[in-house]
Regions:
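Conserved, mostly hydrophobic/aromatic
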Residues: 7, 60, 83, 114, ...
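Mid-to-C-terminal alpha-helical segments outside catalytic/metal-binding sites
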Residues: 1-6, 15-62, 66-67, 244-256, ...
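Catalytic pocket-lining loop regions of alpha/beta-barrel enzymes
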Residues: 122, 137-256
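Histidine-centered divalent metal-coordination motifs
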Residues: 7-13, 164, 194
């Protein structure tokens, strides 16, 4: 079976920033927030202080993963130029997103540079109050003034936009706003990351919001579900349950497998992040969609 990892991160230089201040690599795959909290972010053997394209390709090759979608996030720090360079170097292996801070004074200039000058066709916004923009900015609306120029530009050039909005306990969790954007800009493909970050015992919220977002131009990636249900062990039954719920509501054609490595691969073996999604959830044709076809359509067919 061919596989695309639809949600992964490169880290040339660890330069994260969030609600806990700056994040600095300290070696052995670990990084420390300004608050003093230490996180293990890079799987052993794949980088002391970084997670390069070469390390990622080795991880992919060892696990028969053909392609990967390189997304951005505040936790590692924006890696826009490095991602662009690696996509140019390995066009058959990578599709890459760029990101900007919607509060940046020169955001229009940045948008035009990445899209018009460099030809980037994917955007990623880590909105999440936990690890993203709303961790260090006041609450803003995903379809509000701060984002309007971004959505308009995305519509002009038919980009794909990936969004991490955190879980339902956070101010960043705005499925209603995503629905409004999707209806306003039907040519923009939107990927909601982490399957809305479901919480164990709150399946009715997941069902409600999947139904709300069951629109032709919205997809959901399955990245980091084993880590979100942090008390589960392989084969991650809570994650499997959430995926079955999603399949029943939006269908396999709207689901994209992703790992969210490197952090998740430091927690669990990368192969387990692939193999927990199996024939108990999807039939053979559905597996092909979730692991390859959907990501190819949403991300790679723009390149």
């Amino acid at each position: 079976m061919e596989i695309i990892d639809g949600h992964i991160h490169l880290v040339e230089v660890m330069a994260g920033y969030g609600r806990r201040g700056e994040l600095r690599a300290i070696g052995d795959g670990k990084a420390r927030w300004a608050s003093g909290e230490i996180m293990e972010l890079i799987p052993k053997g794949y980088g002391e202080k970084d997670f390069t394209a070469q390390s990622l390709l080795r991880l992919m090759n060892e696990n028969n993963v053909k392609k990967a979608v390189l997304l951005q996030g505040s936790m590692y720090g924006f890696q826009n130029e490095y991602t662009y360079e690696m996509c140019k170097k390995y066009p058959e292996r990578f599709a890459g997103a760029f990101t900007i801070d919607p509060f940046a004074k020169n955001k229009i200039e940045l948008l035009n540079h990445f899209i018009d000058d460099l030809g980037c066709k994917i955007m990623k916004f880590e909105i999440s109050s936990g690890g993203g923009l709303m961790g260090y900015h006041n609450k803003f609306l995903i379809d509000g003034n701060e984002m309007e120029d971004i959505w308009r530009k995305a519509s002009e050039v038919n980009t794909t936009v990936a969004l991490d909005i955190g879980d339902y306990t956070m101010e960043s969790y705005q499925p209603e706003a995503i629905r409004r954007v999707a209806l306003k800009y039907p040519n923009v493909k939107i990927v909601v990351c982490h399957l809305l970050a479901p919480i164990k015992g709150k399946e009715e919220i997941l069902k409600r919001d999947l139904e709300l977002l069951n629109l032709p131009n919205i997809w959901f990636d399955l990245a980091a579900l084993p880590a979100i249900f942090s008390t589960d062990i392989y084969p991650f039954p809570s994650a499997q349950k959430s995926i079955k719920i999603a399949k029943d509501i939006v269908g396999a054609s709207k689901l994209i497998w992703g790992s969210d490595a490197p952090m998740t691969a430091a927690r669990d073996p990368y192969k387990n992040l692939i193999n927990y999604i199996n024939e108990d959830i999807f039939d053979k044709e559905e597996m092909k969609m979730v692991f390859y076809d959907n990501a190819l359509d949403v991300y790679f067919n723009k390149h």
